[in-house]
A protein has these predicted regions:
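An acidic- and aromatic-residue-enriched active-site/binding cleft used to recognize and process polar
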Residues: 19, 45, 72-73, 80-82, ...
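Gly/lys/ser-thr-rich phosphate-binding loops in alpha/beta enzymes
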Residues: 74-75, 83-85, 104, 262-285, ...
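Short secondary-structure boundary/capping segments
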Residues: 83-84, 101, 295, 382, ...
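Terminal, basic amphipathic appendages of nucleotide-handling enzymes
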Residues: 136, 148, 240, 281-351, ...
């Protein structure tokens, strides 16, 4: 696969899109190790702003041949120097893939060009499903968002720090916005009560009282300490603590705090496209030095997986149901035939469940085609249920399409 990618890169200035930051680092290591005649760069959200801007400037000035990037280059990049997009796998949805493809040939009368590279057999069908949906112009539906309580709470707190608010007039203003158009006044008053003193559960504790109400029924923040805390903590995004990575005086970027659990002084890892050795660790910083030795150890980031969209899932299952694989590569035809001989192909509105013996136990495999996050939740619930029913699940594995649980029981015991 790398050789085919290399042949494309020799003819085209390219952005290679991947789905995770760890995948970007690993691909950069592999491709730069093998092909030294081309200039590559890496781009993702955990690199420092300075490094990202330098990379963008180099690509704009034709100083590099390809950037390996996550979704950090999906939006707002209008370079006419990019003639080709390569996407490793799919970004788990049609809309995002179309957006990525649109980064190429960004000039009048030009046609965007892209190559999709599946990384396994099932992902081949996912890539084909994406292409089918794009040809039919069937894009992912964007769900209507209902206004979130935490956003509304923060809005009330911020208003209280400014000129205050009166509940009835503010309610009339809020329901004019689309996300809160169905908000009931009684529920809105519960939100106000919660912001005022913690609501009916916490109103007996003074520390939760943040607002005061004057004789004109105007709510305002009750003291300067609360005002300062509110202003300093504006925002609703859950922030995972990050640790800064520095090379000398240069900040390379950030890694998740949990990376500290897997690294110690003297360990080597790859970050920002270079191999480094850890020389010092503190509570908020990992200091490193550059080394020549290549290493495949890379930081893994919390929340890095994209969710498989419903429309793409349904299109994959339609491909299996139509069962027309004559034009597919022989390896894919053999893969499908082997599945049909031993079991059956997954179908829409049905969940395929398989079990088979393995060593002293057996595997229970469930094909959900609902994405990694859904399969993670199902695995946790099913593991708990099996334990409650006297079984001994030892481990589970999962991907976007299925989950497998290894159980310390024979298949006949499970069926019984």
């Amino acid at each position: 696969v790398l050789e085919k990618i290399y042949q494309i890169l020799k003819r085209n200035r390219t952005i290679i899109f991947v789905n995770t930051r760890a995948q970007a680092e690993l691909l950069f290591i592999s491709i730069t190790k093998k092909y030294k005649d081309l200039k590559f760069a890496i781009h993702h959200g955990s690199l420092s702003k300075k490094i990202r801007l330098e990379t963008e400037e180099n690509m704009r000035n034709n100083q590099i041949n390809a950037i390996i990037s996550t979704s950090s280059l999906e939006m707002g990049i209008d370079w006419d120097t990019i003639s080709q997009i390569i996407n490793i796998g799919t970004p788990k949805g049609v809309n995002r893939l179309v957006q990525r493809i649109g980064r190429s040939n960004h000039k009048y009368y030009s046609v965007p060009k892209a190559v999709i590279v599946p990384t396994n057999k099932l992902e081949y069908f996912e890539c084909q499903a994406c292409i089918n949906l794009i040809k039919k112009k069937k894009y992912d539906l964007i769900d209507e968002k209902i206004g979130s309580n935490d956003v509304l709470c923060q809005h009330l707190l911020i208003l209280s720090c400014m000129y205050g608010f009166e509940s009835k007039s503010l309610f009339k203003e809020i329901i004019k916005t689309h996300p809160y158009k169905n908000l009931k006044y009684s529920y809105f008053l519960e939100i106000v009560s919660f912001v005022f003193d913690g609501g009916y559960i916490l109103n007996n504790y003074n520390k939760w009282t943040k607002l005061k109400k004057d004789n004109r029924n105007i709510y305002r923040v009750n003291d300067e300490n609360n005002k300062r805390n509110i202003i300093m903590n504006i925002g609703t995004i859950i922030d995972n603590s990050n640790i800064r990575v520095t090379l000398g005086k240069k900040i390379l970027g950030d890694v998740d705090q949990n990376f500290l659990n897997f690294i110690k002084k003297g360990d080597c890892f790859s970050f920002s496209g270079i191999s480094v050795e850890c020389i010092n660790i503190s509570a908020d910083e990992i200091r490193v030095k550059k080394i020549k030795k290549k290493t495949l150890n890379v930081p893994v980031y919390w929340g890095g997986n994209l969710s498989l969209t419903k429309s793409l899932t349904n299109e994959i299952l339609k491909i299996f149901e139509h069962n027309q694989f004559e034009n597919y590569p022989s390896k894919l035809q053999n893969f499908v035939k082997n599945q049909e001989d031993k079991s059956t192909l997954p179908k829409q509105n049905l969940v395929l469940i398989e079990s088979f013996p393995y060593k002293l136990g057996s595997y229970l495999v469930i094909y959900t085609f609902r994405g990694r996050q859904a399969n993670q939740t199902i695995s946790n619930l099913l593991t708990r249920t099996l334990i409650d029913n006297g079984y001994s699940p030892l481990n589970y594995i999962l991907n976007d399409y299925s989950l497998g649980i290894f159980i310390n029981s024979k298949v006949r015991d499970l069926e019984g």
